[in-house]
Amino acid sequence: MIKKSLMAAAVALSAVVYFNVSGQTADAPSAKEAKDTKSSGQKAVQQKAEKAAPNRTANAAKAFEKVSKELYPEAKKEGNLIVYSVWDVEHIRAVTDGFAKRYPGIKTTYWQGRNPEIVTRVLTEFQGGQPSVDTILSDNAPSVLRAAGAMASYETVQKDVLVLHDPTLPTVSLQVQALTYNTKKLKSADLPKSWEDVANPKYKGLIALDDPMRAGPLSSMLAGLWTQWNDQTRFNNFIKGLKALNVPVHKSTSAMFRLVVAGEYAICMPALLHDVIHDKEKGTPIDYVKSVPPVVFPRQAGIYAKAPHPNAAKLFAEWLISDEGQKTIDAIGRESSRNDFKSKTSIEVAFPKGTKAIPVTDKLYLEDPKKWLDTYVKPIWEG
């Protein structure tokens, strides 16, 4: 019953995500742009974006203060906030404790689980009519649950400062995927020049590959490349190239990353930017290819359709996106969702100016990752 509900809703509903990075786009550069990245037209666009940025920041701050004053009294009456999240327990505690400190009188509780566990639990509760949870803080789960009709629609008042904006699911953080390598195992001259280059036969035996069929970082990266390339043949050849490397696939990105750090592999396909920077600062032989654009995937604070404390859930989402909330998220090592928030994991700080990040915006992938993988990847990967 749950599976049928997911499939039917995935066809009926649409996911709209807007890529809103100042000075960046999701489109591949044209030949003219590649030859002349300093054209007067581009300079004008960049200058206009930079000039508008302070206004967007100020307007977002005003909008947050206004909605905060409106929501807090109602949220305080509700008295509680219940969060389900895929985040690490210490990370969930950091953001829920920070929220409770900012808004006294609202008690926070949480349950931590993997995305499939969250989806199954929420759908069971939704079909049973249970007002069990307020916020789903995760990456894949909110959009999958939206497709099943289990999420309420809420658009943040701070949308203009978001890198990835979804008009129904507030994006509070980003999963930024970087092409990562062990500096002792691979020289700079031998680095892959692009994500596509990783499938080059010369890297056979050097790559730690995430399982592309488990709906993890590699699968979302593939969804981002699928949209950017818009080329079935090119995409199919890339999957064939990865398969031809004949390397073991890994079920845990963090465990895979540790193997690359230890020198058992030279390349991590892919790794999360905050993990790479964290380990690099500790002096481990790890770095990322800064010339290869990162893939960005939204982490959202979706509101459950039957939330018992809807005002607290809205306030929590707005606080997470606010400057204070983003500082809390940054402190636990997760990437900001704002294009005006500068930290060591910000795209505009961690990558060269003008880097065109690759967003994951595919409708089917966001709503039903398994169906997307079964449609576009499985026939080649397992064929």
Short names for language-model regions:
Residues 142-147, 266-286:
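A ligand-binding cleft/hinge motif common to bilobed small-molecule-binding domains
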Residues 95, 234-238, 308-320, 328-331:
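Short amphipathic alpha-helical coupling segments at ligand-binding clamshell hinges
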Residues 82-97, 108-126, 131-264:
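Extracytoplasmic ligand-binding site segments that recognize negatively charged/polar headgroups
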Residues 178-185, 222-227, 297-312, 328-329:
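A bilobed periplasmic-binding-protein/Venus flytrap-type ligand-binding module shared by bacterial periplasmic
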Residues 174-175, 202-213, 238-243, 249-250, 280-307, 320-343, ...:
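Periplasmic-binding protein-like
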Residues 345-383:
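Extracellular/periplasmic bilobal clamshell ligand-binding domains
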Residues 48-50, 65-76, 82, 86-107:
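Short, polar/charged alpha-helical segment
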